[in-house]
């Protein structure tokens, strides 16, 4: 990795092992994402659907009411911010990997189920719906 002026160059080393040489593209994309994240924050948008489901931001934490007896609190790591609007949760930050990890942890709290479609899903995620017992019995 070389920095010349305002440009960063990632060049494969001479005579290095093939395993190290194969990581060249990985390092290039990691550095590129770090630079891109500083200028434009990365964000993931999650939507939730279900009876009584709601979310609220409390400081740097996110409180989710997902039909359990107690609300679920997701701690926001340093550099991650939450924005809640109606049934949308926006996770944003400068670290692409951390934004994706936090969004996955939120989704894990109540994955979308295929019969009614209730749960937490990514905004553009398509949930394949299944026919229920009544629909399956009527078709038979």
PLM regions with names:
Residues 1-140:
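Ribosome-associated RNA-binding proteins
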